[in-house]
A protein has these predicted regions:
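N-terminal export signals
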Residues: 1-18
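Post-signal peptide N-terminal regions of Sec-secreted extracellular proteins
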Residues: 20-23, 41, 71, 75, ...
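Functionally critical loop-and-helix segments that line ligand-binding/catalytic clefts
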Residues: 22-32, 36-37, 168, 173-242
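Substrate-binding cleft of extracellular glycoside hydrolase catalytic domains
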Residues: 23-34, 42, 49-138, 144
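Acidic, His- and aromatic-enriched active-site or binding-groove loops in soluble protein domains
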Residues: 103, 107, 144-160, 176-200
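A short secondary-structure junction signal
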Residues: 138-142, 171-174
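Aromatic-lined carbohydrate-recognition surfaces of secreted/lumenal glycan-active proteins
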Residues: 155-171
Length: 242
């Protein structure tokens, strides 16, 4: 993984052309926590942190994120972005988007509580995961209802999505995710998974390396992590006033 040549300042990010944001890279956690000092030393600019509970049977140490950890990220000059995922395909707790409107209400309430407890500002978005390759029928019949439940608690403008290029596009088209302050961008975090090499042009983040059984992702001090390219000056980071 290329090492970045230093951290962008908030002032530079806020005033930069969106193209310049491509020099920033974040990580998100797939195995276990990496210390803020290690993240910074590896040349990354921040992390996506989980404002969700640990699902039964999982042993991750990064859910939910703690105030101590986010304070340490910020003390090291690193950006923080909130995301949410509880269930997962193949687990007793299925994908969150299958929980319908009422499930969306409950998940947003949990996310909001944990985001606040970790020090997250009231203006920052939270990205909610659709962690599988769904089709349009599943989006319309299930995921869309869940997102509307999320919206009822958070408001559209604080709701974001993680998923394939198509999932991100559907969420934007149906008006259930908010807008970055960078013109032309939405709260969409696209993963390369299930995207077939296609890109969603409104996405503020692109998950370019994903830890799987066949792909180790990036290594920081022996820990495998996912890697995310920043595509817009406002990518949902806590430290940007909105």
């Amino acid at each position: 993984v290329p090492v970045l040549a230093g951290l962008g300042t908030l002032a530079a990010m806020a005033g930069a052309h969106p193209a310049s944001a491509a020099d920033l890279r974040l990580i998100d956690f797939a195995e276990r926590l990496v210390s803020p000092e290690q993240i910074k030393a590896a040349g990354f600019d921040g992390a996506l942190v989980y404002v969700s509970e640990l699902r039964p049977g999982a042993t991750f140490d990064f859910k939910p994120v703690t105030r101590e950890f986010t304070d340490a990220l910020r003390a090291n000059g690193l950006h923080v972005v909130s995301c949410y995922q509880y269930g997962k395909p193949g687990w007793p707790t299925p994908s969150d988007f299958t929980r319908g409107y009422n499930g969306g209400v409950a998940d947003a309430q949990t996310a909001l509580r944990l985001h606040g407890a970790a020090g997250g500002p009231e203006t920052a978005p939270i990205f909610f995961s659709v962690d599988e390759g769904i089709d349009l029928g599943t989006w319309k019949s299930a995921a869309l209802q869940w997102f509307r439940g999320l919206n009822s608690v958070l408001g559209v403008e604080r709701t974001g999505v993680y998923g394939s290029n198509r999932t991100c596009a559907w969420a934007g088209g149906d008006g259930v995710i908010g807008h970055s302050t960078t013109p032309g961008f939405r709260w969409a975090w696209q993963t390369k998974a299930w995207s077939g090499g296609e890109r969603e042009p409104t996405a503020v983040l692109f998950q370019t390396e994903v830890v799987t059984d066949t792909d180790p992702g990036a290594l920081i001090d022996g820990v495998h992590v996912d890697v995310d390219d920043v595509l817009a000056a406002d990518f949902g980071q806590w430290d940007l006033p909105r």
